[in-house]
Amino acid sequence: MIYPDEEKITYSYNLGGQLEKVHGYKSYGYDYVSKIGYDKFEQRTYLKYCNGAETFYTYDPQRRRLQNLTVNSGGNTIMDNAYTYDAVSNVLSVVNGASVPQSGKAGGQMAHTYTYDALYRLVRATGTYTGADNKTASYTLAMGYDNMHRITSKRQILTQNNVQFNGTLNGGYDLTYTYGADAGKRFQLANVKDVNYRTEETPSESENVNNNHAYEYDANGNLVYVNISRTKKDGVADEKTAERKLKWDEENRLLASDDNGFVTNYWYDADGERTVKTSGESDQVYVNSEFAGGRTNTAKFSLYVSPYLVANQGGRYTKHIYIGSQRVVSKIGDFDSYGSDPRRIQYAGSETDGLSVDYKVKYAQQLQVIKDNYATFAVPYNGEDNNDYVDGKGFCCNDGSLEAT
C-alpha cells in the first residue's frame, strides 16, 4: 500500500496466509511490526513491534479463550494480565500481575472483578490499582435493570491516593435513568438524573452536584435535543446549564450539531461513510443588548480520506497503519513530510476519468449548507466567505485564525 505522502507499506505473510510482518519505506526502511506468531488454531501467540516491545498470548486448551497476555519492553514486564471466565465465557476477572514500576514511572498492578445476574447482565464491578510512589486507587460499580432489560441505575465510587496529586481524591456519580411512557417510545431515554461529586474531603451530600439530562427525539427516533439543567445548593434550578441540538438528514445521518453555540457540520459519501467534519467557534458582541458585531470561524476541519488517512487544517494529516482490523501505528505529518501542499491543485482536478466537475459550484453549495445549519440552530453566522477558489485557495479557509494556520 502506497500512502499519499509516498510511504510504501509492505505486508508479509506466512505459508498459511497469516500476516507476520509490516514494513514501511520512505527514504529509509522501518519495520512497524517485526514479527507475528500463531499457533495451530491460527490464534495470535506473539507480536513484536519495531520498538522492541513484545506481546505473548496464551489460551486455555479446552475453549481457546485468552488466558494470559504479557507485554515485555526494555527488559521489564509492563503488563501480565490473567483472565478468568464463567461457563458462558463472561469475563469474571482481569488481574495484571506485573511488578510495581520504579519511582516516577507509569504503570502498576491492577485487578478487576465482574459479577453478573441470572440473565448475564453486569451488576457489579470492582477494581484496584497499585503504582509507584504509593499510588493507589479503587472503585466499585453497581448497575440496575428493569424487567425490560433497560438500565435503570448506574453508580460508581472511586478513591485515589497520590495519583493526580499528593493526597486523597474521592469521586463518584449516581445515575438514574427514566424512559418514555408512550407506546413506541419505551426504549427511548427521556431523562437521566446525575448526582456526582469530586472532593478531597470525606464525601457528603453538601459536595454533590445535581444535574438532569433531558432528551428529545424526532419521528425516526434520532436524538435532536439534549438539555442539561442543574439544581444549585440553594435549591433553585438552572434550567439551561448546557444544551445540545442535532440535525439529521433523510437517511438518518448526522448533518450538524450545536453545542452551546459551537456548531459542527458533517458530510458523507454515497456509501454513507463520513468524509468531512468542519467546526469552529462563534463570537458575538452586544452593546446595550444590541448586536454590534461578531465573528464565525469554520476553519477547523477533518477530512476522512479513508480509514488509513485523516487530513486537518494547516496541512496536518494523520495516517493509520493496521494489522487486520487492529490499528498499530498513527503517524502525524505536515507539508514538509508530504513533500508539497496538496491543496495547490487548480480546481482540485476538475477533469477526472472523462468527467467534468464544477468544483467552484460544489464549494459554494457546501458553504451554503454551513450557513443553513447555523440558521437551523438560530446561531448567528458572521463568517467571511473565501470565494477565491483558484489555485486551491478555497480549501485553505485562511481567515487569519490560529486554527487555519
Language-model regions, residue ranges each:
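Short loop/turn microsegments at loop-to-beta-strand junctions
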Residues: K8-I9, V33-S34, E54-F56, D80-N81, ...
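Beta-turn initiation residues at beta-strand->coil junctions
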Residues: M1-Y13, K21-Y28, K40, Y46-T55, ...
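Short consensus segments that form the blades of beta-propeller domains
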Residues: Q102-A106, A132-N134, F165-T168, S204-S206, ...
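Short secondary-structure transition motifs
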Residues: I78, Y139, G144-V192, K233-G235, ...
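Beta-propeller blade signature
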Residues: T113-D117
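Extracellular/periplasmic ectodomains of large secreted or surface enzymes and adhesion receptors
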Residues: R64, N72, Y83-Y85, G97, ...
